[in-house]
Structures are given as structure tokens and as C-alpha cells.
Amino acid sequence: MARPEGGYYQDGIRVVSLTEALSATRVRRWSGNERSWDRRRKIGSAVHQACAILDCNGKTWDTAPREWIEPYDAVSHEVRGFCHAWERCKEEQEIIIHLVEHSFFAKLEITLFATTIDREGLRRGEPALIELKTPQLKEAYWGVQLAGQEMATVANLGPPRVRPFKYHRWVAQLFVNGTYKLIPYVDPMDFAIFRQSLNIAVWNRNAYGE
């Protein structure tokens, strides 16, 4: 299931998303003014869409047909730099991709939630979940987001079948100059924070319609 537009639904019922849960509890929050946030959001969305098309078709920004990338280049010329950064990350980190922008429904105890993982695959032969990020400053919620995504992935696919039989969680922080940082997340507290955020978000929705 690819990332849906307009929210996640199961049997006609809207399901709370991972990012909605983190936003409702202010684990995930935005800094800066509304105008800068909107610009960041548009560029980030274009980068995700462009990288997904390229990854799914085994192309790079420079080898893809022009008609594929022109819509994203039109959003901002910065998109090219971010895509080059992801291409460099994949090559240098020996990343093999199995799933691209793949959505899951998952139950955490009795609470249903939905999420979309950016990439699932291998990094240097070991199982990896990788989030692509374009903000220039590291944001605190990234580890919690990845923890929720790991829960959803394992609930749907089961544990990885290659050593060490668990996922390593990474953020590929991409920069417009074509460089990147690959940031590991290992804090077990991230899982507890996600559980609490999801429960509070669902309670708020049921109690107040929020």
C-alpha cells in the first residue's frame, strides 16, 4: 500500500496516523513561521516523491527521463541537490532497497494506527529502516517516529530474517549541496514515547473529536 492522500481509512473508518499521534501530543512540532514551514513542506514532499520514482525505477536524477523530474525541479531547484544527496548515501552506505514509501496498518495492543515507511531494506547487509529528511537541523521526534514505524513493519512483515534479526533505525538527513548525514537511533525510550503518544492521540479523538 502506497502513501495515501487524505488520511488512512480501514473499512470506511479513519485511522489515526503515526505523525498525527506525534503532532497531537507535541512530540512532533514545527519551528519557524508559517511561510517558511510551507516552503519546507513543499520541498520535502517533492524530494520524497522524486526519490521514490527514481528508486522504484532504478534511475538517478541525471539518468531519468526529463519528463519524470521536471515537475519536481519546478517546485524548487533545491530538489536536485537533495536527490543527489540520497543517491550518494545509497552508494556510500551500500543500501539495498526492498520497500519504497510503503504504508502499513498495525495494532498496538488494541489501538490501530497507520504509517508509511520511507525505505525498508539492507544497509551493509543488515536490516534497516531509513527515513529521508530534508530539514537542515536535526529534529527531536525522528527517533520516536522510527520506533513507531519499526513496530508497524514487524507487525506486518515479522522480524527480519537476516542477522541481527532486528532492524537498525536510520535517518538519512539530506542537504541541498549533495551531502548527507546517516543518523542512527537506538534509544529504547523512543518506543515508550510512541506508545504513550498514540494512546493519548486516540483518547483525544474519541473524547473530543480532535
State the predicted function of each range.
Residues 1-113:
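Metal-dependent nuclease catalytic cores that hydrolyze phosphodiester bonds in DNA/RNA
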Residues 78, 95, 102-210:
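Nucleic-acid nuclease catalytic cores
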